[in-house]
């Protein structure tokens, strides 16, 4: 609302395919449907899996660099097992909510942790390309699904992936390769 109240515009389902840069100043964007939007300021809110936007930035000589990220799997468990382990009883009391957990560990100076634990949750596909295998988790408001799920991830550093450290796409390409397996 703040952006709109200040005279800004928000465009959904509108893919940016190029930047408008004049004399080293950002002036606007060009979109896939042929439109051009110019403004004194543009917020680039790329969202999930916007690898193509990193290429647009790089092609426009905007410095980008690879950074460590977390990569992992989503693990599903019967909710009853999590409740038993966390509440230390064979049957969860009806006034207690479905239990959750958080795992955090450092192994050889590398973070390994659970992420986005979804008690009474659902695993859902969320690939952005047809040839990807990507999932996420969520919990309905009542958290009444018989299963729980959680992401379990490990930190991936530049030195974990072959190739020069100066390649800004090294880790993005690695991520894309994993998601296509």
Language model: regions and residue ranges:
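Residues forming the flavin
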Residues: 1-181
């Amino acid at each position: 609302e703040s952006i709109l109240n200040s005279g800004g515009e928000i465009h959904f389902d509108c893919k940016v395919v190029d930047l408008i840069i004049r004399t080293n100043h950002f002036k606007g964007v060009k979109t896939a449907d042929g439109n051009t939007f110019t403004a004194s300021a543009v917020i680039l809110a790329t969202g999930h899996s916007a690898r193509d936007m990193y290429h647009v930035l790089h092609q426009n000589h905007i410095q980008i660099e690879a950074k460590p990220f977390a990569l992992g799997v989503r693990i599903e468990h019967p909710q009853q097992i999590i409740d038993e382990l966390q509440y230390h009883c064979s049957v969860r009391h009806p006034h207690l909510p479905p239990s959750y957990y958080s795992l955090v560990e450092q192994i050889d100076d590398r973070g390994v942790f659970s992420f986005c634990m979804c008690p009474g949750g659902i695993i859902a596909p969320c690939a952005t390309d047809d040839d990807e295998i990507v999932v996420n988790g969520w919990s309905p408001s009542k958290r009444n699904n018989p299963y729980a799920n959680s992401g379990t991830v490990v930190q991936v550093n530049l030195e974990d992936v072959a190739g020069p450290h100066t390649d800004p796409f090294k880790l993005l390409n690695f991520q894309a390769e994993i998601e296509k397996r």
